[in-house]
Amino acid sequence: MAIISQFFAPLPSLTGTLTLTGRSFLPLNLDTQFPKPRLSRDRAATLVLQSKGDDSVDASDRIISAVCYFYPFFDGIQYGKFIITQYQPFQILIQPLFPAIRAFKSFPFNGFLIFITLYFVVVRNPNFSRYVRFNTMQAIVLDVLLIFPDLLERSFNPRDGFGLDVVMSLDSTVFLFLLVSLIYGFSACLFGLTPRLPLVAEAADRQVL
């Protein structure tokens, strides 16, 4: 508990003469063979390659994208100080991450340095695929949004009463959103899917060319 407090989905044959109301029509022969459209080998190969390229994501891209979603969660772990200390399942869920969280929080500028690294080394680097750059940018935007609850807490810091209940509810909501975003983004990337977080995906799209 002391450690916790430090961080806070067979037709019949149709060949014959068709007669209708006494009028005879031309024989219908459905056995006629029509030529099938053919693609050149080069064109067919091009289509296959394009299909594979659109539907597959490299394993390295999946891992890099998945790991990026830990950044906003580690940076906002303090918003879980109320819910983690009150509910043991959250303690059990977060406990394996304590060493990484401790390392992240060990230096005051770690968050800023990681932000600069992810933005300029990954997002603005065309050598990375758009899949990696989009997911990285989505994690960055999610972290930037943490400024708003932080400013609210700094300007409104009640010690008890109704105000404290409001702050506890706000912090718990932010923490749960970060936790769900981590689980959703991490698992989707591992499966090669593209997670789109509410309030975040559109802004990330505009930043990734």
Swiss-Prot record:
Chain segment of the transit peptide: 1-49
Record has Transit peptide as a keyword: yes
Membrane topology, as annotated: Multi-pass membrane protein
GO CC term (a single one): chloroplast thylakoid membrane
InterPro entries for this protein: Tic20 (IPR005691)
Function: May be involved in protein precursor import into chloroplasts. Not redundant with TIC20-I, TIC20-II or TIC20-IV.
Subunit text: Part of the Tic complex.
Name of the protein in its database record: Protein TIC 20-v, chloroplastic
Gene: TIC20-V
